[in-house]
Amino acid sequence: FIVRLTFLLKYLRLFMLIKIFQLSNSKKKIEKAARKLVSENKRRYRKDGFDLDLTYVTNNVIAMSFPSSGSRSFYRNPIREVVKFLDLKHPGHYKIYNLCSERSYNHSYFHNSVERFPIDDHNVPTLIDMMRFVDSVFEWMEKDPNNIIVVHCMGGKGRTGTMICIWLIASDHFKTAKESLEYFGKRRTDTASSSKFQGVETPSQSRYVEYFALVKNKYHWALPQSQTLRIKSITIYSIQGVGKGNGKDLKIVLIMKKKIIYTCFCSSLKSCQGRSVKRLEEGSQQIVNKVLLFSRLRKHQIYYFPPLRLYLHRNELDNPHKQKTWNIYHEDFAVELLFN
């Protein structure tokens, strides 16, 4: 009986070990599939036993998604794996730039070689923060020729691409925003997996890369003089597909330095004046309507790039630029701001 029981226990132990191995193997496969699903066709690092949402944009610039712990590491880069990778490949020579305003981690994971430049998701950095960022990178790179930077936001695409692109311009890899943006997109996109573009797509982010190129190439690293401007009017063109189509159900909120400085409810025209304009285009049956708002907004300081007019077409506006919204935002949809 004892011999049979011993044999049974050994068999049961072997069975349990096999099951644990199978479950562990299955978990790894599920994690791998989940990370692939979330990262889509972003170029991943799959060498030396690593599988990370991480791309060498240049030999000393890395873009990656957020280094996560806990349940988020199931579908994002596990922070311990990122540490293992960087300590193996670039020991003592890497610096992390965390662009997430919404999330952080213990900097001691990366030997406290971390600097934060918080940017809200789908938003842009200020020009001042752009200048601070490139100054910080220059200082780090000049300390040792082996030094590298690792830049991340949450997905390692929009905010990450914005800041890496301005660094590529600052370090003379490229002269224009267009060249820099195209290059980052090509490096971050794994075309063998899918043709979906994984570069900077948000219009405002691309526009701010252009602003940075302007500061470097035209203003020779000096921000243009800050000027106090008053918003004279805001005009929204071709509004017939938005809400009621006459602008009366719109609400306009202006935010500066993450603070709401002005709100206008178009239904009551509180804090502003407005009118709806309909115009029949010559040689066309299309009615083009627009809403014109006259603001009593107090003056605020901004960095001024002439002229005193900002006109943004549908393709230059965040969200209306997406094809899936074009049943709402028609082809001639645009926003115009006049200043004085």
Task: Please annotate each region the language model reported.
Residues 206-230, 235-241:
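Solvent-exposed, flexible loop/coil segments flanking beta-strands in beta-rich domains
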Residues 23-26, 145, 196, 217, ...:
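Structured alpha-helical bundle/scaffold domains in large eukaryotic membrane-trafficking regulators
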Residues 1-28, 89:
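Scaffold helices S1-S3 of the voltage-sensor/voltage-sensor-like domain
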Residues 137-140, 161-220:
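Cysteine-dependent PTP/DSP-like catalytic domain, specifically the C-terminal lobe
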Residues 4, 14-17, 75-82, 126-129, ...:
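Alpha-helical interaction elements in eukaryotic regulators
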Residues 16, 56, 112-114, 132, ...:
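Broad hydrophobic/π-residue packing in well-ordered secondary structure
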Residues 146-166:
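A phosphate-binding catalytic loop at a beta-strand-loop-alpha-helix junction
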Residues 29-149, 171-182, 191-195, 233, ...:
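Cysteine-based protein phosphatase catalytic domain of the PTP/DSP
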